[in-house]
Amino acid sequence: MPGSDLSAWIAGPLPSVTSSLGDWLQGPAELQAEREAEDAWSTSDSVSGTWRPRGEASRSRSPQPSPVGPREGVSEEPSPTTSSDSRPAFRRELHGLRAVALGLVAVYHIWLGRVSGGVDVFLFLSAFFLTGTFVRRLENGRPLGVPRYWLHTFKRLLPPSAVTILLVLAATATFLPASMWQTIMQEAVASAAYLQNLLLVVLQVDYHARDAGAASPLQHFWSLSVQGQAFVVWPLLFLLVARRARAGKPVRRPLIAIIALIGAASLTWSIISTQSQQEIAYFDTAARMWEFAAGSLLALALPVLDRLTGARRPEEGQAPRHRTLRALTGWAGVAALLACGVLLDVSSMFPGWIAIWPLAAAGAVVVAGYSGRRWGVDAVLSTRPAAFIGDISYALYLVHWPILVIWLHHSGQERAGLLDGLVVLTGSLLLAWLVTRAVDAPVRRSRWLEAKPWRALTAIALSFALVAGAAGGWWMFLHRDQPQPPVAEGPSLATDEVATEAPPDVQPYGWQLGQQWPTLPESCSGPWEPERGFPHVNCQQLLPGDATATETIVVVGSSHSRQFIPAVLPTATSRDAQVVNLSMDGCPFLAGTERWPYCAGYDEYVLEYLDAVEPDSVLTTVTQAFDDGTEEILPEGTDGALQTLLDRGIGVIAVRDTPRWGQDQYQCAEAVIDRGGTPVEADAACGADVEDKLAPENPAAPLTALSTPDATVTLLDLTPQICPDGRCAPVLGDTFVYMDDNHLTRLFVEESLAPAVTRELESMAG
């Protein structure tokens, strides 16, 4: 390549027209404005070969600056009769800042397993560009065109996302264990609907878990979901000042007041939520909106800052004031951004106030702008290599995480090493370039798609339908002709021993894990219907509401009580007994004790219900095991809670807790079995001796002394069945014992525990 060509290649691209909208809704001027609008994922189109050398670009542009400074996101919009070349200047250094932010995200994900602050920069830039787009429309007296903005934005963003999700579904079926399939199907649909962050909260995902190989390959869509939700809500704020703009009044000050108020409220909530429930706050859109507000406030204030500091753009042919200070400020911003993840304990502090650090760093680069110095950070960020990464940044964000997760799962590592990490990064760059060329760029530039609103809407709907259809079709294929698991059907191999040879089939299958949570067939009705509802409690019953029951058993407490429901069903069915599930996941029954906010009021709700239905007995778990080696205990207040039941004449079936683990027992054993290993090998890799998981003696033994002539406490200790011969194995016979790191599979409870429980309940009746 000749030297001049190399110099031009390094110098960096200027944007060309990336798409064209038809004349609909608001007319040609708004059509051009929408075309020129930029967001955090915009490209310079250099990937498609339409880059123009700097000299040619600057000769073709109008040198006239905006009265408030020609900065992307804040400068004046062209009039209907103005040449497209006079549009607001493309901020090449901000395009390069995208490359830095995305590079940080990828590097930290692949090698460090830490939060870098790069995602926060994308949220910040999204708001910066979005605000500039709508403020220019307001100040030029043009309609906001919010519906068209939504169509234009999601028409560009969703097709590459859909392609990535479809590739992930295919890779999941090929490379990942069946235990991950159902979750990934759910996340695929949630990601395409921009609801992934909410689903991750429901699934109680820990973003900062050290083992990325155990994470979902779609987990990273949480940030795109937050961004998508903001793209829907944020434009509506500008409608609040639309009438003022039509009257010719200034809109920036009212907008600053509105957005500052929202930002302050969001930041306050973010700080509180991060301190109390950081694993939820990390995915919470409300806890992230202040980052969007920060970008908007900078966009609104930048014209004044530009005017006061004498900012210029390269296209003006004039040097800015304070050139050295601008160059140093830009470098300080990049340095602060690079250092963020290294110097801060972001794993426990984000997204609280500490996220101001990466936003301030990005803001420094924005404010510094064009420095006029060859060594300025803007010059480096404006080079062609930086622009190339910026151009593929959206696709690179989409594909790098799935490639990393699939590789780590295949290799059995928690983090990639230097060499395999480089392979992951290189593969991500190549696939991102391909997705950009084959999907992203054609969709962005398609005049046909932009010509009519229904076409853009069709592209959005089709993208979502492909994902939902693929995930739903896969789910239906797996569950075709699959009956509900039978109650207490005998296993093909004895479940009181660990098989030394690989059984032909170990069940339940991974994609059936969602069916392993015990349920009852009827919603509570008739005399068993609660007088009022309670959050997170779904009252269920065995017999229909109009049935006549000989006795009633109510299951209360946490999911560790709920998991034993299948064990009592054979006895209940034979006796025509009513079984009611009033459990609440995460909340053991401890009436009379102070509870954490999530469980507050649950015990009172249970007692209110019991007073209404007057059951014969209550089944609840009374001890608590731990996954860190801490000895099993009888929680404080358990005896008092049981006494409240006995005083009401209600018998108690007090169940001993099951072992809890530091790793997912199903996935651990599944990995061994999938490689052709035996249950004995799975036990060696995943199991433990019972003395390492439970106390030597049942801590609940003293509770039997609470029994009265009218109501007794019956201890139910199923440890011999769960951990036969003193060993807690993940596979007994041809059945997986655990569905995760602390819950038994429904199939194991039915096959192995139900007979023992039946014998115990029959002895109670005798």
Please provide the spans of the model-predicted regions:
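Poly-acidic low-complexity segments
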Residues: S20, T50, R91-R92, G145, ...
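Membrane-interface helix/loop caps of multi-pass membrane proteins
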Residues: G3, D23, R52, V74-P453, ...
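Selective for proline/serine-rich intrinsically disordered segments
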Residues: A11-P13, Q26, W51, R61-V68, ...
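Extracellular/periplasmic envelope-modification machinery, especially enzymes
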Residues: A57, Q318, V346, H409-L422, ...
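Actinobacteria-biased recognition of intrinsically disordered, low-complexity terminal regions
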Residues: M1-P88, A311-P314, A765-G766
